[in-house]
Amino acid sequence: MSKRQLCILGSTGSIGCSTLDVVRLHPERFQVISLAAYTSVDVIFEQCIEFKPQQVVLVSSEHAALLTQKLNDANVSNITVLSGEQALIDIAECQNSDTVMASIVGASGLLPTLAAVNAGKRVLLANKEALVTSGAIFMAAVKASGAELLPIDSEHNAIFQCLPSQQQAEIGECQLLANGISKILLTGSGGPFRTRAIDTLESVTPSQACAHPNWDMGRKISVDSATMMNKGLEFIEAKWLFNVEAEDIQVVLHPQSTIHSMVQYKDGSVIAQMGNPDMRTPIAHALSFPERIESGVAPLDFFNTPSFEFQPVDFERYPNLELAIEACKQGQAACTALNAANEIAVAAFLDEKIKFTDIYKINETSVKKFVSQKVDNINEVIALDEQARSFAQTLLADFLQTEALSQKGNK
């Protein structure tokens, strides 16, 4: 059996570490060729010692120098340490790997992920923002290069598993409605504030927002789950992965996070994929597809599983989700602007600069500003992303000034 040669973009994050957990179980199947992260020197150093990659990228040159020193001190001399955004792109497209785990968080993962696609590799897509930000442009690159795109998000991986094999082979060009499928049912837990009084949401703290009831995730995606913007981004991603319209996707609240998503067929059947909420399951599925391998995740224990609950979405509680669904209908500019603004707003909330409910205000205003802008190629995507971030930063400055004046007036 020939080993898959892996490049893991975002190796020190939640998805990256879970990927290496699966790889650790199957040394006969996988070889780690390259790792990439932003600044997590200590974590990636330990990964280097264990998995012995040929190349490592830390975007920060300062942190790359620290890693080089740590490797030298450990008498490790056969690992090349690189730095910079271009180095991320270089290792993503380098022909010494055939499979790329694209798990860099946010729009910064777009160009490295696109580079892996253009190189015609098997791309395991955990970076939903890359597809949300570039949509049809990204999928056109997949088609042109012959890359094999496999979804890692638990919901999209679940949908993929529920599809007929011929539709799995047509990712991005699926013809679901013509092949007996009537709807995609995209499930979401509702996050930690599903039952909290709406009028108290403005007082939510970052630590509360990051305390997801079911999943262990990074801080940014945890906040997105609390606002359900994460589900909104997944809604947009589902449109492109499965070639459907917004009207063909329905979001269903499922607090237990046991059913990861469902596909509804025209004959009344609904096929669901379920399991314990652990990202190693979809990662193992995509790494070994079309085979099945051990993931390290215990199978679902039906006798100790709570009864399944399903609820409609309350958009008053989750306005960010409604905004994302509308952006999906409005077009690429709205989606690109929404993602950019949300990254700025969430970072500001995590830094305790704005309130939880201000995230929506920044997002909504940004989408309205850029919804009509032309986006026909990757350069225009990048330009709009930069413009939307700058605009969101301006809005943020206005929020901070208003808050400062308010506090001054109360003294």
Swiss-Prot record:
1-deoxy-D-xylulose 5-phosphate binds at K128, S154, E155, S189, H212, S225, N230, K231, E234. It catalyses: 2-C-methyl-D-erythritol 4-phosphate + NADP(+) = 1-deoxy-D-xylulose 5-phosphate + NADPH + H(+). Gene3D superfamilies: 1.10.1740.10, NAD(P)-binding Rossmann-like Domain. NCBIfam families: Dxr (TIGR00243), PRK05447.1-1 (NF003938), PRK12464.1 (NF009114). It comes from the Bacteria. This is 1-deoxy-D-xylulose 5-phosphate reductoisomerase. Mn(2+) binds at D153, E155, E234. One of its GO terms (biological process) is isopentenyl diphosphate biosynthetic process, methylerythritol 4-phosphate pathway involved in terpenoid biosynthetic process. It comes from Colwellia psychrerythraea (strain 34H / ATCC BAA-681) (Vibrio psychroerythus). NADPH binds at T12, G13, S14, I15, N127, E129, G218. Pathway: Isoprenoid biosynthesis; isopentenyl diphosphate biosynthesis via DXP pathway; isopentenyl diphosphate from 1-deoxy-D-xylulose 5-phosphate: step 1/6. Belongs to the DXR family.
